[in-house]
From Swiss-Prot:
Gene that specifies this protein: panC
PANTHER family, sorted: CYTIDYLATE KINASE/PANTOATE-BETA-ALANINE LIGASE, PANTOATE--BETA-ALANINE LIGASE
Pathway assignment: Cofactor biosynthesis; (R)-pantothenate biosynthesis; (R)-pantothenate from (R)-pantoate and beta-alanine: step 1/1
GO molecular function, one term: pantoate-beta-alanine ligase activity
Location in or out of the cell: Cytoplasm
Biological process per Gene Ontology, one example term: pantothenate biosynthetic process
Function: Catalyzes the condensation of pantoate with beta-alanine in an ATP-dependent reaction via a pantoyl-adenylate intermediate.
Name listed for the protein in its UniProt record: Pantothenate synthetase
Amino acid sequence: MKIISCIEELRDHLRGQLRTAFVPTMGNLHDGHLSLMRLARKHGDPVVASIFVNRLQFGPNEDFDRYPRTFQADVEKLEKEGVYILFAPTEKDLYPEPQEFRVQPPNDLGNTLEGEFRPGFFSGVTTIVLKLFSCVQPSVAVFGKKDYQQLMIVRNMSKQFALPTEIIAAETYRAEDGLALSSRNMYLSAEERAEAPALFKSLNAVANEVRSGHLDIFQLERQAMADLSQRGWKPDYISIRKRSNLQPPSAGDMAQGEKLVVLAAAKLGATRLIDNLEI
């Protein structure tokens, strides 16, 4: 595996490749990330991964400096997965001057759910993804469904900018007890880790109610948040949305069998967890 930080060197190595598959990450890789590499390999060759902790997507009170950096361990994992190039730029490589041009997702996608609680987050995400796409110029890129809103926004960005990159969605990788794998799970205490699967159980309970014909989504959302609060969580949202555009479904949508997804974000102790489940 080649480790490259220079954009021009990366382009030189990839010039002439017909179907490069790309997986962007912020490092601290776990089995969920590695499942993305395997899916990428099914859709393209060579596989390029990136590791870059993107300052632009962290808010002023978020954990940029605290975010775990495990570069050498990440390298070993990627080598075992047969990744061809690890693109590991420095901030100076990607931001040689202040990034004054930013991508701004549309309000109905970018300022709801995560965007409401993390202002500017999706602008930071889409700006770095667009820049990484420019560097790698992939035919396909793999994003996990765990970050469902991010996946939808990147997919829409790629479509609306007519980028020659197909966005592939990977299923959420879960521990045996249902907890979605996340780099932030390492912040959980042993007691919190034992409680953490309750978030996915809550999503399943909501989904089962919808499947059984319960159409009062606001009541379902309120009850699910109240149940988590009673267990010691601090929920930001549990919200049922249309898969197509992440807007709340109307009564007509519900009656006509619109495809839905229920999304959640909640703090357990000091750790904020997100998850979702398609209905």
